């Protein structure tokens, strides 16, 4: 489907990535949050270049090696390419359609985890032309059902400027500081 243009399965990209080193605490915390009943979506917050994306790959590697709790075994992590998803969307409806199709194909899959780098861009994303749209509202049903788990990443600055303003997102994501 269309959505495969906007997501990459990290589990299938591992051979192109170096193993994660020195992030065991953050990785354990991420796994712990993903296994909880509530507020089970980790949000990695740290300065640019500290390795937030590397953590998502590190988790995919642990899943592939079977070194995760039963609840996460067999999970697949997909990275959302927000840039290409927003590219060429002249109308907010275009962006909404793309996001919906991604979410739909992920819900059909068991144990999908969607990694969204620079997740603050979803808050107020698609404010194209005069109609403003908050894409985080489109994620809320999925966040509530819990059939798709999310991992977000952002910087402290963007968190404070955008993410912290969305009470619904703050309520569903658990902050994990990446130093």
Where do the PLM segments sit?
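N-terminal pre-P-loop "Q-motif" helix
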Residues: 2, 18-30
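Walker A/P-loop
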Residues: 31-72
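Short glycine-rich substrate-engagement loop in P-loop NTPases that contacts/grips substrate
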Residues: 78-107
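Sensor-1/coupling segment of RecA-like P-loop NTPase cores
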Residues: 143-161
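Conserved AAA+ ATPase "SRH/arginine-finger" region at the nucleotide-binding site
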Residues: 174-179
């Amino acid at each position: 489907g269309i959505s495969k243009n906007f997501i990459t399965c990290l589990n299938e990209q591992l051979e192109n990535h170096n193993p994660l080193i020195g992030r065991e605490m953050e990785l354990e915390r991420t796994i712990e949050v993903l296994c909880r009943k509530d507020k089970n979506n980790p949000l990695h917050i740290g300065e640019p270049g500290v390795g937030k994306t590397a953590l998502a790959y590190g988790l995919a590697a642990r899943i592939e090696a079977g070194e995760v709790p039963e609840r996460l075994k067999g999970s697949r992590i997909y990275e959302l390419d927000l840039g290409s998803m927003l590219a060429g969307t002249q109308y907010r409806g275009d962006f909404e359609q793309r996001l919906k199709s991604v979410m739909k194909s992920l819900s059909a899959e068991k144990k999908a985890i969607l990694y969204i780098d620079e997740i603050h861009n979803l808050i107020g994303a698609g404010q194209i032309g005069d109609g403003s749209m908050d894409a985080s509202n489109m994620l809320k049903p999925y966040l509530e059902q819990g059939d798709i788990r999310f991992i977000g990443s952002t910087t402290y600055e963007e968190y404070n400027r955008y993410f912290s303003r969305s009470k619904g997102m703050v309520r569903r994501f658990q902050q994990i500081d990446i130093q």
